């Protein structure tokens, strides 16, 4: 048994810039701040906030849709309900499906959107790639939605091992 104290989960503070927008809901602001924090490299948060402004304006002008609503619907279309965990039992490794916490599902959705946007080759800059991927994900298309579907197919294929995760949790390992 570990002698360390349990880690306190820190809340990511929403960006001050988007709290003043009355049209955005608290869930949309939370998703925008998660996207900003995931894209930030070497502490350049202001640069990423400007990039998010470009993304929202691009969606607004090209598709005549609210950028925050597109972000929310894209994350809701991409977030997984099941994940596959590797579990080693008796020398064999099993892929065991387990349910996903809501905060983790949003984190995975944002990560998958960013990764599939980075793999796009049609657009030139990253903000254009993310804007297009967000719009496609909000319509149920794109690489991030495909990643979610692949994840769910893997979980369904390994449904026979789902009883192992309950045994593992009841033992306390």
Curated annotation (Swiss-Prot):
GO cellular component: small ribosomal subunit
Alphabetically ordered keywords of this record: Ribonucleoprotein, Ribosomal protein, RNA-binding, rRNA-binding, tRNA-binding
Pfam families per record: Ribosomal_S7
InterPro entries assigned: Ribosomal_uS7 (IPR000235), Ribosomal_uS7_bac/org-type (IPR005717), Ribosomal_uS7_dom (IPR023798), Ribosomal_uS7_dom_sf (IPR036823)
UniProt-listed SUPFAM superfamilies: Ribosomal protein S7
GO biological-process terms attached to the record: translation
Gene Ontology molecular function terms on file: rRNA binding; structural constituent of ribosome; tRNA binding
Keyword rRNA-binding on entry: yes
Highest taxon of source: Bacteria
Family: Belongs to the universal ribosomal protein uS7 family.
PANTHER family found in the cross-reference section: RIBOSOMAL PROTEIN S7
Role according to the record: One of the primary rRNA binding proteins, it binds directly to 16S rRNA where it nucleates assembly of the head domain of the 30S subunit. Is located at the subunit interface close to the decoding center, probably blocks exit of the E-site tRNA.
Complexes and interactors: Part of the 30S ribosomal subunit. Contacts proteins S9 and S11.
Protein name: Small ribosomal subunit protein uS7
Species of the source: Orientia tsutsugamushi (strain Ikeda) (Rickettsia tsutsugamushi)
Name of the gene: rpsG
């Amino acid at each position: 048994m570990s002698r360390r104290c349990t880690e306190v989960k820190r809340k990511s503070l929403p960006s001050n810039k988007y709290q003043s927008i009355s049209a955005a809901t608290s869930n949309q602001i939370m998703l925008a701040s998660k996207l900003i924090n995931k894209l930030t490299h070497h502490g350049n948060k202001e640069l990423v906030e400007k990039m998010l402004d470009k993304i929202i304006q691009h969606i607004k002008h090209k598709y005549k849709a609210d950028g925050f609503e597109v972000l929310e619907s894209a994350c809701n279309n991409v977030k997984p309900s099941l994940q596959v965990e590797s579990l080693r039992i008796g020398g064999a490794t099993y892929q065991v499906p387990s349910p996903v916490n809501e905060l983790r599902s949003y984190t995975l959705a944002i990560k998958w959107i960013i990764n599939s946007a980075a793999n796009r080759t049609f657009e030139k800059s990253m903000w254009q790639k993310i804007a297009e991927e967000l719009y496609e994900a909000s319509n149920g298309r794109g690489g991030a939605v495909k990643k979610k579907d692949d994840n769910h197919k893997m979980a369904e294929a390994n449904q026979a091992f789902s009883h192992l995760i309950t045994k593992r949790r009841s033992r306390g390992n």
